[in-house]
Amino acid sequence: MSVKSTFRNGSAFPLALLFMLAAVLACSSGSAKKCTATLTLGGLTFVGEDAAEEKATRNACNKYCREADPGYEAMYGVWLDSPAGKAAGRPSKEEAIFKDKKLMDYVTVTCANECLAKIKDGKGKVETKCD
């Protein structure tokens, strides 16, 4: 059977579909790595997840910053009462970082770096497990 006749009788389409299905299954069959970091800081526990161990730890720090950092609490309170906070509909502490760049930078850069430094200094403890 020549290539020309294969395309004429329509059997090439199911064959191509079969190859595509095999490629999709091959690419998606491996389970993605998942790391979970459990941070204990100030007597409270925060969990962060990511495929990378370092990012899981940073995500746990970000969660600490949003939920328990006094600096973020103060910034959020001031912003919430500002015209920008009112215009944004007075969002939650978690949502506010997506509405204001300064809040986002404080959580993900300033506070997160301080949190990582506390871990390094032994003031905070993090346990990370990757599957």
Regions found by a protein language model. Give the residues of each.
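Bacterial N-terminal signal peptides that target proteins for export
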Residues: 2-16
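Bacterial N-terminal signal peptides
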Residues: 14-24
